[in-house]
């Protein structure tokens, strides 16, 4: 959430930033809603003060045996009570209108983020590896998996509908191995703390991660009002919800391997074949909670951690900076890591690493205190995929495929699959 004090002071900067995201000016409307709310609150506070004063004056009038004045004051107090009864309801309405408007505004892009309409304006900043040249036409992952008889979309559809997959045998083991490998790298070598988190969370937790109210249609909600997590970012970031941290404890770095659940409401007709876009998938997530001064350096570090996983797996990839038109709602800057898929003949996203500033910290009321300073600041948060397990499995299938349809297992994964070197039908 943005800082309304900043918006009041720099309304033109807000509208300039929103224009970079293709959004109409909002500062005037927000300031008006805020003024209405604050004016009403001031009236309520004034009425409460007068009620309290009048109540004391009643006692003074009675002590002075001035019954007429006491009755007059009682009538005034009753009148104020009637006003406050309706005013409280109005205050709630005005506050909800203001907070709803403020909570639907995206974060402010950093100055070095390129302005663009969509992904076509993203900027490639580096490559790793060279896509392999095959002496045969490389297949896509769904053909490879089905030919191995270890990737079943028909049975998955009977079980759950579209955008689900049943993996079996060596492919199921390889998927499990990938998640364990990624988590081991981040925890043992990159300095993240492994965390096992709930998969069901409350409204305020999803709100704190900036996925509510704007993205409710993209999520799954249970009948008792809880939400299935779309990413472990949601619970990991909220581990510091409503907490005051000491600066000496920062940064906090968390990592978790979880299933993720997404309705893909806005993805009709996109990636309908295969495992690229699923309602349920595994992902290793990285989250950092840090200070304003350290957040940009932490973004570079987190992105390097995600890249390191792909380097160890020998997968060609490129890293891009997302333009303002392609960047996520809560992000100030995002690096996407895109892995090469020879079957598709293109790069596809496998990780996003974003710095969110204090956007989530403000929603969560998560703050930190500097040593010797009583002033509290909102924490800065970052999140990144470390990486998407299913998409990494896809990349291994396509990049390590052989002419006979078998799949070579990368060396670093072989200890996780009991020394298996190749997957065959």
Swiss-Prot record:
Amino-acid positions noted as binding ATP in the UniProt annotation, renumbered to this chain: 262-264, 349-352
Listed GO biological process terms: selenocysteine biosynthetic process; seryl-tRNA aminoacylation
Any one GO molecular-function label of the UniProt entry: serine-tRNA ligase activity
Catalytically driven reaction(s): tRNA(Ser) + L-serine + ATP = L-seryl-tRNA(Ser) + AMP + diphosphate + H(+); tRNA(Sec) + L-serine + ATP = L-seryl-tRNA(Sec) + AMP + diphosphate + H(+)
Keyword Nucleotide-binding belongs to the record: yes
EC number: 6.1.1.11
Compartment(s) where it occurs, according to its Swiss-Prot or TrEMBL record: Cytoplasm
UniProt keyword annotations, A-Z: Aminoacyl-tRNA synthetase, ATP-binding, Cytoplasm, Ligase, Nucleotide-binding, Protein biosynthesis
Binding site for L-serine: 231-233, 285, 385
Main location: cytoplasm
Matches recorded under PANTHER family: SERINE--TRNA LIGASE, SERYL-TRNA SYNTHETASE
Subunit structure: Homodimer. The tRNA molecule binds across the dimer.
Role according to the record: Catalyzes the attachment of serine to tRNA(Ser). Is also able to aminoacylate tRNA(Sec) with serine, to form the misacylated tRNA L-seryl-tRNA(Sec), which will be further converted into selenocysteinyl-tRNA(Sec).
Family: Belongs to the class-II aminoacyl-tRNA synthetase family. Type-1 seryl-tRNA synthetase subfamily.
Name of this chain's protein: Serine--tRNA ligase
Organism lineage string: Bacteria, Pseudomonadati, Pseudomonadota, Alphaproteobacteria, Hyphomicrobiales
Gene name as annotated: serS
């Amino acid at each position: 959430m943005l800082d309304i004090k900043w918006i009041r002071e720099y309304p033109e900067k807000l509208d300039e930033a929103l224009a970079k995201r293709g959004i109409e000016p909002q500062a005037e409307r927000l300031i008006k809603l805020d003024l209405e709310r604050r004016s009403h609150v001031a009236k309520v506070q004034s009425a409460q003060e007068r009620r309290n004063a009048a109540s004391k004056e009643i006692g003074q009038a009675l002590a002075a045996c001035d019954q007429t004045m006491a009755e007059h004051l009682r009538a005034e107090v009753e009148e104020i009570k009637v006003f406050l009864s309706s005013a409280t309801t109005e205050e709630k309405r005005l506050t909800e209108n203001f907070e709803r408007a403020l909570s639907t505004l995206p974060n402010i892009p950093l100055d070095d983020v390129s302005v663009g309409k969509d992904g076509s304006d993203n900027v490639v900043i580096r490559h790793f590896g060279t896509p392999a040249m095959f002496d045969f036409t490389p297949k896509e992952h769904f053909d490879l998996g089905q030919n191995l008889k270890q990737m079943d979309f028909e049975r998955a559809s009977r079980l759950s509908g579209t955008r689900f997959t049943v993996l079996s045998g060596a492919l199921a083991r390889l998927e499990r191995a990938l998640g364990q490998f990624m988590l081991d790298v981040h925890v043992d070598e990159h300095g993240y703390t492994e965390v096992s988190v709930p998969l069901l969370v409350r409204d305020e937790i999803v709100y704190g991660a900036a996925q509510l109210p704007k993205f409710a249609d993209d999520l799954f909600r249970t009948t008792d009002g809880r939400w299935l997590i779309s990413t472990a970012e949601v619970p990991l970031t909220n581990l510091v919800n409503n907490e005051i941290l000491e600066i000496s404890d920062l940064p906090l770095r968390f990592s978790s391997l979880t299933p993720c659940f997404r309705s893909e409401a806005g993805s009709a007709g996109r990636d309908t074949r295969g495992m690229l876009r699923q309602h349920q998938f595994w992902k290793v997530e990285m989250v950092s909670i840090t200070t304003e001064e350290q957040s940009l350096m932490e973004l570079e570090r987190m992105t390097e951690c995600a890249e390191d996983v792909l380097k160890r797996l020998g997968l060609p990839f490129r890293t891009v900076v997302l333009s303002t038109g392609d960047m996520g709602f809560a992000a100030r800057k995002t690096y996407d890591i895109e892995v090469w898929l020879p079957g598709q003949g293109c790069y596809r996203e496998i990780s996003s690493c974003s710095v969110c500033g204090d956007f989530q910290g403000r929603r969560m009321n998560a703050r930190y205190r500097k040593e010797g300073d009583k002033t509290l600041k909102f924490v800065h948060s970052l999140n990144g995929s470390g990486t998407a397990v299913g998409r990494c499995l896809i990349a291994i299938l396509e990049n390590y495929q052989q002419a006979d349809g078998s799949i070579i297992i990368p060396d670093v994964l072989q200890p996780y699959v009991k020394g298996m070197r190749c997957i065959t039908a």
